Amino acid sequence: RMETYMTARNSEAEIEEGLFRISVFDFDKRAFREALVNAFCHRDYTMLGRVRVEINDDGLVISNPDGFVEGVNINNLLTAEPHGRNPALADVMKRIGLAERTGRGIDRIFEGSLLYGKPMPDYSESTDTLVKLFIPRGLPDKAFAKMISDEQERIGRALPVNSLLILNELKRNSRCTITELADVIHSTEAKVKTASE
């Protein structure tokens, strides 16, 4: 039922990649799945409330009761050590193929937008009693997506999420300093240099 709901509201665009065309959806399907799995795996089941999914003209919203897991906040989402509130449930989700084995599903959520130069996922409305993810609708930046694809093909592997964050910020503001880029990835200037190589 959720897949039908999603498919009906998930517009598609195409990007030419050499002789091939790549479908790019408003909301990356893997990112959506990871966000939904995270909402169920990391919520506090002692609290009343539901996992909510809403797709509207502005974007996709997924929210769940309770705040982030202890030790995780909006500033370290991508850098905090992965650990869950419900490890048994997370393990079952991994075993049946719904969750990331690496415990880095949050990376997938960001990659779903960053790979195509689209607006970043936003957790800024999360509180101590609610985790709320907003993924804005946005057209892919075809030139940016091609540059990312070409670079990944050249190096023979996927770019890490920190590199994607840096490239996305440089696309937005080409005059960024290393210090500003360190703020973007919530890390050190040394890690910016490593991610940029």
Predicted regions: what they are:
Residues 1-197:
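C-terminal regulatory or interaction extensions
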